[in-house]
Structure formats: structure tokens, C-alpha cells
Amino acid sequence: MKEILIADSGATKTDWCVAKNGEILFRFTGKGISPVYQSEDEITEEIQKNVYPLLKNWPIDAVYFYGSGCIPEKTAVVRNAIYQSLPVETIEVY
């Protein structure tokens, strides 16, 4: 199994964690992400400027994003923003 990225996000902060086989390899905290308060472009900018630079050397295979405001109508906003910065095959937003 390869590395996965898990994000637990509220409106004020996001906890990011790279894991492999149940072991935490790297973790950090960033700004909050909420599609209720931010556009896809704003979320993309946040990920590109503050998340991607910390993850660019990790071979991430999947992203699992758990966030406030990720109602069914808004999950595509977050999924698209993640994909623009971290183009992995599996991106799940809850």
C-alpha cells in the first residue's frame, strides 16, 4: 500500500496527515477549508500555496478529505480544488 493523505478540516484549521499501512509518516496543520465560505479558486490557491509545497516529495496515491461544509452540493468544489494541486486518482470528500 502506498501513501494516503487524510485531511480533517473545519472553517478555521485543517489537520493534514500522510499515512501508510496505518502508520503516520508526516502531519501538519494548515488553514481551514470550507466550500460554504470559500470558492473553488480560493481553496485551490490555499492548497497550492500552503499544502502542496509540504507534500510535493511524498508519493500520495489517494486523498480523503473530511470537512465542515462538505455537503453533497459542495463536495465537487473541494475535490476539484484538490485535484488541481494533487492530481491523484482517488479523491474522496466527506
Model-based region annotation:
Residues 3-45, 58-59:
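Short glycine-rich, Thr/Ser-proximal phosphate-binding strand/loop in the N-terminal lobe
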